[in-house]
Amino acid sequence: YGKTKDLTWVAGGMYVGNFEKVLFSPATFTAGLEYQNNSLHDVMTGYHRDMKQDVRIASAFVQNEWKMNQFVFLVGFRLDDHNLIDNPIFSPRLNLLYKPSDKLQARITWSTGFRAPQAYDEDLHVTAVGGEGVLIKLAEGLKPEHSNSISGSIDWTANIGHFQTNLLLEGFYTGLDDVFVLEDMGHDQNGNKVKERRNGNGARVYGVNLDGKIAHGRDAALQVGFTVQRSEYTELE
């Protein structure tokens, strides 16, 4: 058993403006600021653990969405200043939607992100392996994990007699740099098994997703889908 005090608060503001023309077409501009604060104190007496962590993140974000005849194009970025990371993190994103008709649309998206070198919820729980408790600690000099993601999808809708149908096909790929991995560190002085979170070389996650739906008005609907996904390290960890 343990006792955790966890206080989180968030404050921010956002501006949204619609403009008749920005560069080449009508656009919606969005910008904002956000500040997050989290204070954590976790005590687990039975495992001789007393952990304190203060996380403060100041963020700014900007995006602009252009709307043209058959296209919607979005470009934006987010800037995060994290107190546990030396330099601010710049995270851009792009999105392009092509809609040639009311029944068909295609989308492609590229985005970036990161995970800070901090303790997460799963680190506060004692994992049991073979009846033995396992504690997770953070390595000295742990760097943030960065991600690059790209996805594309085709969404098709059609009416067949009295039935409405929809088919969505999506492909996705995410590459991770300085990926977080757990290394076995043996046992601590109290006999607890310890694993250390370190930076690995990299990893990737990719796959396809297919969803289909058929409905008869509001009377009945059937939806099926499946996902094929593969996750792997770029090098043996």
Predicted feature descriptions by range:
Residues Y1, K99, R107, G141-R198, ...:
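Membrane-embedded beta-barrel scaffold of Gram-negative outer-membrane proteins
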Residues L7-G13, R56-V62, F77, F90-L96, ...:
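Hydrophobic, lipid-facing positions within transmembrane beta-strands of outer-membrane proteins
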Residues G17-L23, E65-Q70, F90, Y98-D102, ...:
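Outer-membrane beta-barrel strand-turn architecture
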Residues K67-V72, N166-L167, G171-G175, E196-E237:
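Gram-negative outer-membrane beta-barrel transporters
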Residues L104-T157, V179:
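Outer-membrane beta-barrel translocator/channel fold
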